[in-house]
Amino acid sequence: MQNSISQTSGTATSPRLIDVVKRLAPSPSHQHFDELQGEGSPWHNFFEQLGQTDLNELDRRTQTLARQVRDNGITYNVYADQDNPQRPWSLDLFPLILTPESWATIEVGIKQRADLLERVMADVYGPQQLIRDALMPPALVHGHPGYLRAMHGVSPVGGTHLHIAAFDLARSPDGQWAVVAQRTQAPSGLGYLLENRLLISRQFPQAFEAMHIQRLAATYRMWVESLKAHSPEGANAHVALLTPGPHNETYFEHTYLARYLGLTLVEGHDLTVRDERVYLRTLRGLEPVHVLIKRVDDEFLDPLELQPDSSLGIPGLLQAVRAGNVVVANTPGSAFLESPALLGFLPALAQKLLGQHLHLPGVDAWWCGERAALASVLPQIEHMVIKPTYAKSKLHGTFEAILGRSLTQAQRDEWVGRITRQPERYTLQAYAPLSQMPTWKNAKKGIVPRSVMLRVFALRNGKGLGSDAWRVLPGGLARLTGVDADIASMQRGGSSADVWVQTHADVDRSSLLPKYNSATAFKHRERMVTSRSGENLYWLGRYTERSENMVRLVRLCFEALNSETPASQNLWAWLQQMAQREGLVPEGLPATHSTGDAKNTAHMGGRRRVFERALIAGLNVGKQSTSVGYNLRSLQQAASSLRDRLSTELWNAIVNCVQQFSTDCAHASTPGKFSAVQAMQALDTASAALAGITGGQTDRMTRDDGWQLLSIGRHVERLGFLASALDLAVELGVFESTLEEADTLQDNTSHFAALLSLFDSTITFHAQYPQSRELAPLLNLLVQDDENPRSLAWVARTLRGRLSKLCLLYTSPSPRDCS
């Protein structure tokens, strides 16, 4: 596939899509295997199932897919893009389709390789006979930062080192699959491929059923059961997924995978080691953790024995592993297996350890630390891919893989010099042209070819050695190259595709839903709330309430500035001091109210314009910790650490609110121009969005301990803000002015209306005290009313109730002891 396939929009008599593809598809490339035109290609069946689907319909499905990706909050953090590191996940409309015969070859080869890596790992951290027999260079093991000396001689619980392994495959021009790389430390993709499957199968449900595509759920369930079986606790083992946190590039899939598999999502400081056992810090005390699926690199796992400045790990974790009290998947110390140099030694290792040839070949690789290899391949650097032997090593230096053919002669000479000076740092791998699969661009450009690399996963299916101890997930993650790229990488701007594996057998339609055998299985279970989650929920509540308060206060200021009826001097003093106290405008602004000075009064209009511009300019200040925009971003930051607890709709509402407010503020404040109208529109939009977010927190979250803390955070913030506002109003004589004012209640610049608006109690006051202008009803509503959720008494009573409930749970049987 070298050219694009395009077609004008379909009509009522549009030809079948397969006919369009057959007629316009170009001849296969001699440099790349063509998935579309290859022998026995399943694509013909796929397009047959689409029938008379026209290209505009494919465009509509692409748009639907992109919207679903956004709505589901699927992201991938790109470290190289400082301006926009968090990007929507890129997913192509068409899946990569594998025949049963092609998959059988992959499956057998991957099982064998996973078994081989397990045996290599056991030897390296045991007798090291492979090094003694000169089958592995010591420098590739002991010199690799991924080899952990602290783990030598450790026999992991259950006797298994590896529970998961990922392999990146390329299809050569002759149609044969070969291994390009292997990942064992913390392989990513298990969550993204699940989401890919969910989205793409919905786009082509008829084709998915008719083509007998294998399901994924049974393999995931088997893997979790295998992990539990390795623990002494067995089926009752508590399994947690250890994540570096929301700033990690694949954090979305950590939260998604934890939710899908029913795991507890934890960060390093959620865990502690006591008496050589791992515990989870929860609001109700310590809970044991028996199995830990880690997505943190090994070097950061234990600051006591590894990276001392790591804040991602758990002090004492390695000792808990030595004691056999926790299963870690994978056992720390497997990173050396990821070295590209090791690929060149695996054929001999397979002969030694398995007595077999490798069923699935690897792309040839040469470690330059061997003189003979260096002499033979360095002159061919133009046809090689240059890779670091010790990836991510601070000591040896690291870099992204480089295609020799992409270098100029001068650059190649420079690389030859580098490699010659320190050859052990470099590995040369033969360039493997990736196969090309059809991808959908749009109705104008049609179907275009993209090079693809396939990542497949081997998952543990029990204890012991042998290929039968592994199962290959019948699917995978297809990574497509970016435009004009030869290396598939999400960090380099590539995209992904679902992977469909056909079967001749019956499709296993198992799900992850447990089979309950008795009514006791349905008994109420308290959800564990980690201490970190509790803290983030508390601040989620505070920042939500604070954002709402700041929006109302700024709107009130703008209404006073732009009202036809001038606000009183006391009201101006109150609003300006409130804005300054909350940090919405800088200190030192000229007074917006009369101070008795005739000169001050004469320039009042100009002073208020300065105040208005300061309000607009400070709406979205990034470094000002009290701006509306900062509080909204802090709200999103707190929510990002709670993705496993928040609904997709609530998370999207928060993200959209922050993004929309930032966009609106940019329009309201441009160099030399400030627009109060656009600023008010930004605040109105944010206010409506925050109302939805509050509703989501109120009605879409379980009333567990975490929600109690969220509610406490909201009410602490509300009580502090409203009490402060009333205190300042009394100090400045606003209530005395209220007794004298003769404005109508509809005038938002009146003291009555201003106080009611800030307390969000305008409608309530009108309903309870129609046409009333008296101070007593106003104070009763704002201070003492037991049914107004904005009154100080209601907030204080509710806050006391929430605190008492938590106190009853943890310390005392009597609420009196908690007051």
Go through each PLM region and give its residues:
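N-terminal amphipathic, basic-rich helices that act as targeting or association modules
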Residues: 34-42
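Short beta-strand or tight-loop elements
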Residues: 162-165, 382, 424, 452-454, ...
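Short, surface-exposed, low-complexity cationic segments
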Residues: 42-59
